[in-house]
């Protein structure tokens, strides 16, 4: 499969820049990273930095220099110089339409399967300031993420959190991954388990970063609709830990879910249930706040925010999700006034 050519541009300071620019701002040719002529150097060699993709003589930013990508130069009088790499522009987008077709495995996330990289491009990783992943979330516009309120219990200060977009691996971030600080957070006023995060700068919309669609207000998902939950959460098979997983889950109508043998009246009208009544599949911790999306006509619509479940993938105990359609008026009001 031919990768669509990435535009030759950088995000932020270009730490993840993987383009082919090979001249400095003054037009001087770059020295190959593996070469020792005209300049001898030992720190930024491909051997010393296998993860930095120091290939040929392309500009790179292996040390996270605030001035952006650079290279050693072919001018014997000048050791290194910066390169003129433009910032990436956002692409126009249709919400809920991935550029990479999802696998849609009917496996069971404790069951689930590993997702195809970037096939759920609205999935975000909510992290501590130090980069530790602890919850999921969903990009719903370039500047806004929806997550679970209980994910924000550790602190009410936005500076405590950051959002990672466009990554498949929890630890090894993809080249085009974006890390953006949170500038504001809003908890739903009636204490529902849902919250909005405003990003400090808009996400750049790329083929790996695309918002999900929101449902119409008060929309009720059809029983047994084709819905998927995604996340990096705990799985029984820990060999796949750290990569994004998906599971297809049927939605179960509230009156069935609230029967005595299932969740026995605990599910509110502003919540929805999804899961296999025989158990075995479910989203689990670490996927709190993440998306439950349902495919309709030609796009994925965010219908649920992962909230709670009794145990993990136990028979007769489906997972419970906040019903996004119950909060559309609140979501739109906050987004418009901030």
Curated annotation (Swiss-Prot):
Catalytic class of the enzyme: hydrolase
Subcellular localization: Secreted
Catalytic activity: Preferential cleavage: Lys-|-Xaa > Arg-|-Xaa, higher selectivity than trypsin. Converts fibrin into soluble products
All copies of domain Kringle, residue ranges: 9-88
Catalytic residue list: 150, 193, 288
Enzyme Commission number(s) of this protein: 3.4.21.7
UniProt keyword annotation of Ribonucleoprotein present: no
Record's keyword terms, sorted: Blood coagulation, Disulfide bond, Fibrinolysis, Hemostasis, Hydrolase, Kringle, Phosphoprotein, Protease, Secreted, Serine protease, Tissue remodeling, Zymogen
Disulfide bonding pattern of the chain: 9-88, 30-71, 59-83, 95-213, 105-113, 135-151, 227-294, 257-273, 284-312
Site (Site of substrate specificity): 282
Organism domain of life: Eukaryota
Site annotation Interaction with streptokinase: residues: 157, 191, 269
Molecular function, one GO term: endopeptidase activity
Pfam families, A to Z: Kringle (PF00051), Trypsin (PF00089)
InterPro entries attached to this UniProt entry: Kringle, Kringle-like, Kringle_CS, Kringle_sf, Peptidase_S1_PA, Peptidase_S1_PA_chymotrypsin, Peptidase_S1A, Serine_Proteases_S1
Recorded GO CC terms: extracellular space
Other observations noted: Plasmin is inactivated by alpha-2-antiplasmin immediately after dissociation from the clot.
Subunit architecture: Interacts with CSPG4 and AMOT. Interacts (via the Kringle domains) with HRG; the interaction tethers PLG to the cell surface and enhances its activation. Interacts (via Kringle 4 domain) with ADA; the interaction stimulates PLG activation when in complex with DPP4. Angiostatin: Interacts with ATP5F1A; the interaction inhibits most of the angiogenic effects of angiostatin.
Family: Belongs to the peptidase S1 family. Plasminogen subfamily.
Protein name in UniProt: Plasminogen
Species assigned in the record: Equus caballus (Horse)
